[in-house]
């Protein structure tokens, strides 16, 4: 139809579509409406609408010189920030054109040295929506290490930290309408080991229709009054770390994004 023709023209002209096409292993933008994308029960029309919005978001958000860095698969994209740990090391946060395009065009990753701790894949549209298609812990980090890392982060679990980072990313672009996939509707649901719904509910999500959860427009925060007095200093450090990470992230995004009005 007309919308697909217009979309095809954008795919032929946009730098991000060309980079996606030139990067080994990535699904071409033109093929997205016809392939597995975000939700295995989604119609071609719904896929086209999101892919069209995502194409515009990426092309119009990132500076032309920053775009190729996002597609540098060997380097896992562009480093954004470092989050300091208690022991003096840090977690590196990167933004990458997602190697799993079917879970969304963009991926935020957390690394400890050269090991991936957590990653989340998502699509953002030019009209202010986000669609989260996958979240995954690192294969070379075991449960004991996750526990140790949680201690180093004043009690923040790595998967909650990546959610905080995603919220920081989305709020920078004023994206408030956020949907997250139910693992049963994940494009490769047979390979998903964990139940996503538990996490979406824990962070305040509500069951939406057709395999989606709708997440709160911004991260829900506990207030100090809700925390037992003996845990308060830890809580304050935790919140401080999250807040600083989001501020650093916003500054890093300003470096790679086109200046927006307003």
Residue ranges and their predicted role:
Residues 1-149, 235-262:
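Non-catalytic substrate-recognition and accessory regions of acyl/acetyltransferase enzymes
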Residues 117-118, 123-207:
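Acyl-donor binding region in acyl/amide transferases
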């Amino acid at each position: 139809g007309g919308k697909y023709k217009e979309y095809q023209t954008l795919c032929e002209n946009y730098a991000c579509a060309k980079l996606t096409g030139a990067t080994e292993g990535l699904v071409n933008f033109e093929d997205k409406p016809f392939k597995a994308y975000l939700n295995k029960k989604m119609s071609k029309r719904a896929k086209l609408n999101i892919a069209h919005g995502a194409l515009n978001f990426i092309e119009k958000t990132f500076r032309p010189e920053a775009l190729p860095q996002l597609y540098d698969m060997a380097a896992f994209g562009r480093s954004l920030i470092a989050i300091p740990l208690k022991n003096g090391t840090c977690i590196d946060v990167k933004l990458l054109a997602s190697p799993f395009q079917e879970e969304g065009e963009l991926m935020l990753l957390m690394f400890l040295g050269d090991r991936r701790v957590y990653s989340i894949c998502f699509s953002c549209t030019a009209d202010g929506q986000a669609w989260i298609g996958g979240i995954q812990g690192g294969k070379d980090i075991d449960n004991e290490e996750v526990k140790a890392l949680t201690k180093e982060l004043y009690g923040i679990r790595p998967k909650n930290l990546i959610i905080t980072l995603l919220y920081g990313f989305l709020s920078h672009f004023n994206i408030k309408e956020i949907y997250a996939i139910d693992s049963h509707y994940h494009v490769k649901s047979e390979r998903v080991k964990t139940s996503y719904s538990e996490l979406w509910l824990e962070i305040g999500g509500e069951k939406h229709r057709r395999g989606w959860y709708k997440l709160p427009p911004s991260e829900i925060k506990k207030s100090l009054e809700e925390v037992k007095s003996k845990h308060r200093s830890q809580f304050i450090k935790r919140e401080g770390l999250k807040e600083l990470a989001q501020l650093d992230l916003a500054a890093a995004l300003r470096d790679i994004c086109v200046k927006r009005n307003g």
